[in-house]
Amino acid sequence: MTSSALVPSGLPGSLDRIAEVSRNTAETRVSVRVNLDGTGQAKLRTGIGFFDHMLDQTARHGLIDLDVDCAGDLHIDGHHTVEDVGITLGQALARAMGDKKGICRYAHAYVPLDEALSRVVVDISGRPGLHLHIPFSAGRIGDFDTQLTHEFFQGFVNHAGITLHIDNLKGVNAHHQCESVFKAFARALRAALERDPRSAGRIASTKGSL
């Protein structure tokens, strides 16, 4: 197990849903900044080109401003980099959401990319859960090991406190499969994070907390 140091900013419950988190271990040094009410701008430096491309899809289609800087042990492989970015992004998202008052909480999205079709269902529940099925047609996409898709989302949900159901329903090209998943994730997350004006700032749970 590695140790980590969190350096957050932003106030829970504030109107600005912005947060910055740093995570430093013997394997990676990661900093993530998110603005949940952004315009989809992204600055991404993970050292893995295809992974940067997927994070860019998340920002663009989620309308989240996202700044990710990671220096990882890529001389070994991409596992620690991808997993730790997922962890740190989850921590930043959790902090930026604050008390979660007024958010829609639940959402889903279907996104096609040519022959590929993916569905993602989100519950911002406070309970981490990942249920993922992507029958990738190839083990690698450029310099990206497709198994790391699971590691990214597992790290993310564990620290964001989100339940995700991710299914690639159709697909032949592995690039298309993965990209349709990330686009659907972005669209569903964007909808779940939207503030519902009819909720009058209430928590979307009969428990009174998420």
From Swiss-Prot:
* Organism name: Verminephrobacter eiseniae (strain EF01-2)
Q: Sorted alphabetically, which PANTHER family does this protein's record hold?
A: IMIDAZOLEGLYCEROL-PHOSPHATE DEHYDRATASE (PTHR23133:SF2), IMIDAZOLEGLYCEROL-PHOSPHATE DEHYDRATASE HIS7 (PTHR23133)
Keyword vocabulary terms for this entry: Amino-acid biosynthesis, Cytoplasm, Histidine biosynthesis, Lyase
This enzyme's EC code(s): 4.2.1.19
Q: Output the GO biological process annotations, alphabetical, semicolon-separated.
A: L-histidine biosynthetic process
Traced from the root, the source organism's taxonomic lineage reads: Bacteria, Pseudomonadati, Pseudomonadota, Betaproteobacteria, Burkholderiales
Main localization is cytoplasm
SUPFAM superfamilies per the UniProt record, alphabetical: Ribosomal protein S5 domain 2-like
Where is this protein localized, as stated in its record?
Cytoplasm
Q: In which pathway does it act?
A: Amino-acid biosynthesis; L-histidine biosynthesis; L-histidine from 5-phospho-alpha-D-ribose 1-diphosphate: step 6/9
Reaction equation(s) it catalyzes: D-erythro-1-(imidazol-4-yl)glycerol 3-phosphate = 3-(imidazol-4-yl)-2-oxopropyl phosphate + H2O
What is this protein called in UniProt?
Imidazoleglycerol-phosphate dehydratase
Q: Which domain of life does this protein belong to?
A: Bacteria
What InterPro entries does this protein's entry cite?
A: IGPD_sf, ImidazoleglycerolP_deHydtase, ImidazoleglycerP_deHydtase_CS, Ribosomal_Su5_D2-typ_SF
User: Does Lyase appear among the keywords?
Assistant: yes
